[in-house]
């Protein structure tokens, strides 16, 4: 039985949640990503892995629709976590949730700034700036998740946190 036949791990569930591709097509993407793990790991950085995936899965190249930036980010994070590829303390603002959270937290006031990566074209903020913004804010938040989370955990938390705030309004 192929290692791609059964997908029960949380990475698969996250990728499915963010993808607009059909389950069948997404399974092809997932299996191809798993097969190419060694190639991606050799690239050595989140940025290079992400760009490689975006090129591979752009609709025109792969013929599979619905594999956008968020799905590529999730696939890239799967590899980065599995092989301990550093994000260099960058919290990537993938999608509107983390971007809105960063605006609500006023992360860009003062010394912190939103940076755009020259390699990926995506925006990010530094983890320390996100932690400091939460600590300075008057909003309720999960102190443990923010203080002890890695870059991807904090990005996910920002998305969920912002979503909960919108529901309360």
Identify the meaning behind each predicted range.
Residues 36-50, 54, 73-169:
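C-terminal accessory module of base-excision DNA glycosylases/AP lyases that mediates lesion recognition
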């Amino acid at each position: 039985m192929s290692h791609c036949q059964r997908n029960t791990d949380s990475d698969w569930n996250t990728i499915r949640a963010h993808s607009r591709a059909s389950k069948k097509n997404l399974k092809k993407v997932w299996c191809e990503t798993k097969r190419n793990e060694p190639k991606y790991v050799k690239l050595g950085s989140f940025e290079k892995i992400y760009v490689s995936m975006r090129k591979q899965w752009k609709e025109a190249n792969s013929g599979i629709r619905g594999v956008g930036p968020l799905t590529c980010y999730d696939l890239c994070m799967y590899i980065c976590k599995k092989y301990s590829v550093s994000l260099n303390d960058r919290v990537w603002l993938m999608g509107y949730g983390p971007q809105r959270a960063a605006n609500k937290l006023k992360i860009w006031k003062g010394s912190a700034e939103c940076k755009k990566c020259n390699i990926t074209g995506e925006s990010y903020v530094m983890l320390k700036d996100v932690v400091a913004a939460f600590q300075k804010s008057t909003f309720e938040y999960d102190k443990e998740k923010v203080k002890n989370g890695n870059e991807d955990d904090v990005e996910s938390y920002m998305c969920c946190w912002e979503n909960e705030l919108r529901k309360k309004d």
